[in-house]
Amino acid sequence: MFATSGAVAAGKPYSCSECGKSFCYSSVLLRHERAHGGDGRFRCLECGERCARAADLRAHRRTHAGQTLYICSECGQSFRHSGRLDLHLGAHRQRCRTCPCRTCGRRFPHLPALLLHRRRQHLPERPRRCPLCARTFRQSALLFHQARAHPLGTTSDPAAPPHRCAQCPRAFRSGAGLRSHARIHVSRSPTRPRVSDAHQCGVCGKCFGKSSTLTRHLQTHSGEKPFKCPECGKGFLESATLVRHQRTHTGEKPYACGDCGRCFSESSTLLRHRRSHQGERPHACATCGKGFGQRSDLVVHQRIHTGEKPFACPECGRRFSDRSDLTKHRRTHTGEKPYRCELCGKRFTCVSNLNVHRRNHAGHKPHKCPECSKAFSVASKLALHRKTHLGERPAECAECGKCFSHSRSLSQHQRAHTRARTAAAVAIQSAVGTALVFEGPAEQEKPGFSVS
């Protein structure tokens, strides 16, 4: 039961008597010992399902009772499983650990980042004088000025960095800094001889500056994905990618926009969103001139002009211009609905539909009509509503020519035609059947009539 002194010193005092493996907690040891002796399973009295642990059985029984026992003490959000609550609380703890700047209120994830911010933004920086032209600059601007205004070989400053790059004007105070910088030129020029400490992949020949980067790259060849999601079992190459993926299950969005308050699950998504406030759209379409904040969005947009649909569904052959559209479409074949509302339990095929559904619970309707101030939770519903003000009726019925402002009303109208045709067919069939009943005996009385 109890481990050796070495295991105790390592913080694992509970040892398995069968294999000698040590654990930090007795509860973990008990679960491990069940793997040696019998199944030791726990059975649900309502449906007969068996669980490996008592905690799993309790979580399973809550699905019958519809309970949501685990409530976040910070924001009041409720969860069915304690594991999801732990992930959610980790986001609160991460935000609490951030270091705020007392001068401007900006927050940073750790103390070194805060100190660097204060040194760059709030502490008065002593100006540095260029020894060649006597102009004064900040430290970072001085290095840039010397590289541009005084090229290699023109400086006589004894305090200048002694290690200069042979490919560009940059200089470094240590040889290690120069060697690290030289990897940039190696990656940019494949014909240039590689530096001695470059790491090459034996499968595809690609080179990397660090062995750790090469190790991660080799996993792409082997297909190894060591970090598994406990909710859906999906594997990932890096733990950071797994953490971002788990936010799709918990609904956690720790990155908030300071301009409009909108929250995002990833910092990169927040940066792209902030460009919409700044009006920054550097990637323009050469065909129609529409601008985009990210190049990948431009590539997807250009497929509208070219008609390219490179992503095909293996089930039905339908093609799509965007991979994410294919992923959502394939769920219609599998019936998979991985995104679940934590308030009512309703499930959805994509996270965007879940976010729209959540607005119904919160009563949040951010899209307002400029004509009548009516608000909607989805922009598409606002677009349909505005057609009533503009008088647009682009959807025309092929049978009677009646026009409608949107296709949904046209579909409802066409069902009326279908019902009318069905009722007419039933009436005709009934009339024909009645006529046959009355004509049958009269025809049988005619001479020479026989029934086969």
Curated annotation (Swiss-Prot):
GO biological process: regulation of transcription by RNA polymerase II
A GO molecular function held by the record: zinc ion binding
Zinc finger annotations (C2H2-type) as residue ranges: 14-36, 42-64, 70-92, 99-122, 128-150, 163-185, 199-221, 227-249, 255-277, 283-305, 311-333, 339-361, 367-389, 395-417
UniProt KW DNA-binding keyword: yes
Subcellular location: Nucleus
UniProt xrefs under PROSITE patterns: ZINC_FINGER_C2H2_1 (PS00028), ZINC_FINGER_C2H2_2 (PS50157)
Main localization category: nucleus
Pfam family name, one: zf-C2H2_4
Source organism superkingdom: Eukaryota
Any one Gene Ontology cellular component term annotated for this protein: nucleoplasm
Cell cycle among keywords: no
Record keywords: DNA-binding, Metal-binding, Nucleus, Repeat, Transcription, Transcription regulation, Zinc, Zinc-finger
Free-text function comment from the UniProt entry: May be involved in transcriptional regulation.
Family under the similarity heading: Belongs to the krueppel C2H2-type zinc-finger protein family.
Protein name as it appears in the record: Zinc finger protein 672
Organism field: Homo sapiens (Human)
Gene of this entry: ZNF672
